[in-house]
Amino acid sequence: MRTLHWIAAAALALAGVAAHAGRSCEPRQPTAQTIAQGMQLAQQTAQALDASGARVVVLARAGQDLSRYGLRYSHLGWAYRTPEGPWRVVHKLNDCGTAVAAVYRQGLGEFFLDDLWRHEAVWAVPTPAVQQALLPVLADGARATRLHQRAYSMVSYAWGTKYQQSNQWALE
């Protein structure tokens, strides 16, 4: 099962050209049903992550319908368990309708309330050595953003240095 999660994460990352974070630029009030679905997904994900014993995972969500590209998930970030217990997600989003992006640290609830196409998630668990190395980096805002490039392009070149796409940041 872990292999499938890694394959899904890799496919998502390699398909960054088509991927978006799923954020609509249209002002839209969330419905009670949307909030309930997002919070339920956050709770289910937290329980599953807690049960996994992992401290750090690559976490993906289905922000928009990318099925025409053969993709199921559109956005990913790094999730880590805090010493207090809750999970936090560090991920990059562009400012709506602009070519400027920032790295955000959110709880699972906020991560899954971001106008999802489908209320489902997938994650991959890195090796214990990778988790141990990433945990202090993710918990430290300055270190977590060291490779962040504010200039955003949805179709940025993976080896380019001028622009950066959301999923590209997570992989770098």
Predicted regions and their residues:
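N-terminal signal peptide c-region/cleavage motif recognized by signal peptidases
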Residues: 16-18
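N-terminal, Lys/Arg-enriched amphipathic/low-complexity engagement segments
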Residues: 20-55
